[in-house]
Amino acid sequence: MTQFVRVGARKRVDESQEPIVAEIPAVGPEYSPHSGAISGLPDIPELGAPAPEESMAPSPSNARSAERHQIADTELGVSSVALGTSVFGWTLGIEMATEVLGRYRELGGNFIDTADSYASGRSEHLIGSWMREERCRDEMVLSTKIGRNPDFQGLGAAGIERAVNASLRRLRTDRIDVLTFHVDDRDVELEESLSAVDALMRAGKVRYLAASNFSADRLLEARVLAANGLPRFSLLQTHYSLLHRAEYESELALVARAQGLAVMPYFALANGFLAGGYRSRASIVPSTRGLRIGAHLNRRGARVLSVMDRIAGDFNVQLATIAIAWLRAKSSVCAPVVGVSSAAQLDAVMAASDFRLSRSDMIELDRATAAN
């Protein structure tokens, strides 16, 4: 029987498992800055609950978990980690993407994040084909983003309607569980965008709405409009990780808590740096993404990796597990969005569902990364 809790969760990772060294490609014709490429337990705390006195090591299991965490005030029950799919149809072809989706489902995952701009819609197409082949659409919670596809640029009413209908066709489904505004389109009145979504919700094509890359003031404006009968945001996607904290932890965190928004951090592994795969500049391939990773090769980056190495040694987990577990322990965080470049990397990612950091470990990690 499926259990619903608010947020939380534990798993063992084999040290021989392939390390996650790539969170997502950083350049390319269809690049979008989201998604990241890189046994339910009843005693899970509510959002923002205190961490345990001692870190809780994961238990070995490959069985599909029945535990789901309820998103804010929605009826959606999701796994603790959302699968980012920005590389589907780009650096991951149909065979590898299918393997990733299958392994994610096998490990208990049910929350898939995509966008109509990922690989010019090929990501959505691969996901839709896989769900139809596996006959698992009703198991999955599907989130897709609109607003950045060149064919449906922006968040005007007509563009939103066309974009959603196109996504529904590619995904081979009759509804989108979470529709996300990929950008804050300041050229269009927010009231127009929300009204367009309202019509789609009434038609049964969209269930819930999320915002991505929205400022605190725009979230407040949206809430005022929602108070007058327009759809409200239930989720917020934002850049947040151990190495990128200030942007979210200032105003956005306060607004998210006040509005009851479920937060989905992206770039959770800092382009793979927090997975421990990059310890020197010699390990970085020259690229835009390489420049982003190289920015963390400093005292602060070395400090956080040192703390993570110690925790990893104490509990036989990979660094990626720790980075995601840290996010999941933060107030309002629902499901970090994490992508992988192979199915083998998912074990470390999903192990974060079954691993909780202690208060002392959380404090040590917070101190190591305090200066943003």
Regions found by a protein language model. Give the residues of each.
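Active-site mouth loops of central-metabolism enzymes
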Residues: 84-95, 146-158, 182-187
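Structural motif
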Residues: 107, 170-171, 204, 259
